[in-house]
Amino acid sequence: MEYEVVIGLEVHAELATKSKIFCSCTTEFGGEPNTHCCPICTGMPGVLPVLNKKAVEYAIMAGLATNCQIARYSKQDRKNYFYPDLPKAYQISQYDLPLCYNGYIDIEVNGQKKRIGIKRIHIEEDAGKLLHDQWEEGSLVDFNRCGVPLIEIVTEPDLRSSEETRIFLEKLKAILQYTEVSDCKMQEGSLRVDVNLSVRPKGSKEFGTRTEMKNLNSFRSVVRAIEYEARRQIEVLESGGVVVQETRRWDDPKGISLSMRTKEEAHDYRYFPEPDLPPIVVDDSWIEEIRKRIPELPDQKKERYIKEYGLPEYDAGVLTSSKAIANYFEECIKYTQNIKAASNWMMGEIMRILNDKGLEPEEINNIKIKPNQLASLINLVDNKTISNTIAKQVFEEMFETGKDPEVIVKEKGLVQITDRNVILEAVKQAIANNPKSVEDYKNGKDKAFGFLVGQVMKITKGKANPQLVNEILREELEKI
């Protein structure tokens, strides 16, 4: 029997506010344990929360950017459960009246557009953090993260594969970064993904029993966890077993998911309205004010790159998939008119060094090559000061040292040779040294010509103008 995977996501994104959602404590990452907290975020008796207006604005902006409806009236609720990192024994969240609802994000999979529904986006406070490896006799609790504002983005169960899920998450992350709603640093926990997954016979309209997977700290982990869990559930069903509705923890080093607890239902949390906070009332003028502040989003920027710069759709998609990459590219083309070359260098060498160094696209500003320096390198090729081959050598040194390309070219004497007489001497030497290749060329073997070009470049240490080499070499070979 062929099975279909059904996936829905719960994505938690930390909002980029300077202070927490209900108090004035800083949201800055790190710090000594329990130094970024106060009686409000640690739930001491007698304190009252005050809602951070900026957190609501960011949530509305996220909703507008993902095509959601914005609730004119919503409220906050207490979600009651006991866990050591939750000092009040309840979390202030939203239950039946979320701030944003009925949205969508369009993604492209194998050239086909697909719409993924956003069921709701609501605001809530983060919990603390348990540290299990710093004390032999038990676990320690750090409340620095307690009360940091979050949005939880809940999708409809519209995703059907690990690849669709990865593409969706990359698109969502880009939207949150473009709007500056969240920095989405997964390594710091500011973007966290829970995956709800079930399988069903292909063609069936009924959903199977779902499991929820947690502890997914990278998109790679999400992809691996989905593929593992789908296989596990199919094996259970094919062996005559029953899939248990439960929460499972992903163990990335082992590549397996492990049972944590049976899945809770809404009634297990005993939701009730938060008595210490008034309802959230949003009027049209506030929504429009926030809408006007939404910057150019990835899809809009991609279309502009295609129309304005004439870039291929794929290139435009890669260059706009990360705000940091797009900003780097746009800064680069301020200093060069060769936009296509800038795109090629970004898509090729820049992406390669990011991958080689294990850097995320958002970390592009950490490399030593600045956008204006990349533009200078492109200009050196365009004005025939250096060849493309030499440019790649210069690029490597720029990456290692951060030096300007002009400085490297001057220091190493890499200026391109355009003197016809100098190139002619190198051509004659290559012909004299390789009579067999000359004979092969005369007998119609085109590869021999490429070999001879390579020999000329070797003699000139890669500095000869390739076009002149081709031209002069053909002229000399015709004379033989």
UniProtKB/Swiss-Prot annotation:
Pfam families: GatB_N (PF02934), GatB_Yqey (PF02637). InterPro entries: Asn/Gln-tRNA_amidoTrfase_suB/E (IPR017959), Asn/Gln-tRNA_Trfase_suB/E_cat (IPR006075), Asn/Gln_amidotransferase (IPR018027), Asn/Gln_tRNA_amidoTrase-B-like (IPR003789), GatB (IPR004413), GatB_C_1 (IPR042114), GatB_Yqey_C_2 (IPR023168), Gln-tRNA_amidoTrfase_suB_CS (IPR017958). GO terms for molecular function: asparaginyl-tRNA synthase (glutamine-hydrolyzing) activity; ATP binding; glutaminyl-tRNA synthase (glutamine-hydrolyzing) activity. Transmembrane segments: none annotated. GO terms for biological process: glutaminyl-tRNAGln biosynthesis via transamidation; translation. The keyword Transferase does not apply. Its EC number is 6.3.5.-. Keywords: ATP-binding, Ligase, Nucleotide-binding, Protein biosynthesis. It is an enzyme of class 6 (ligase). It catalyses: L-glutamyl-tRNA(Gln) + L-glutamine + ATP + H2O = L-glutaminyl-tRNA(Gln) + L-glutamate + ADP + phosphate + H(+); L-aspartyl-tRNA(Asn) + L-glutamine + ATP + H2O = L-asparaginyl-tRNA(Asn) + L-glutamate + ADP + phosphate + 2 H(+). Heterotrimer of A, B and C subunits. Allows the formation of correctly charged Asn-tRNA(Asn) or Gln-tRNA(Gln) through the transamidation of misacylated Asp-tRNA(Asn) or Glu-tRNA(Gln) in organisms which lack either or both of asparaginyl-tRNA or glutaminyl-tRNA synthetases. The reaction takes place in the presence of glutamine and ATP through an activated phospho-Asp-tRNA(Asn) or phospho-Glu-tRNA(Gln). Belongs to the GatB/GatE family. GatB subfamily. This is Aspartyl/glutamyl-tRNA(Asn/Gln) amidotransferase subunit B. It comes from Caldicellulosiruptor bescii (strain ATCC BAA-1888 / DSM 6725 / KCTC 15123 / Z-1320) (Anaerocellum thermophilum).
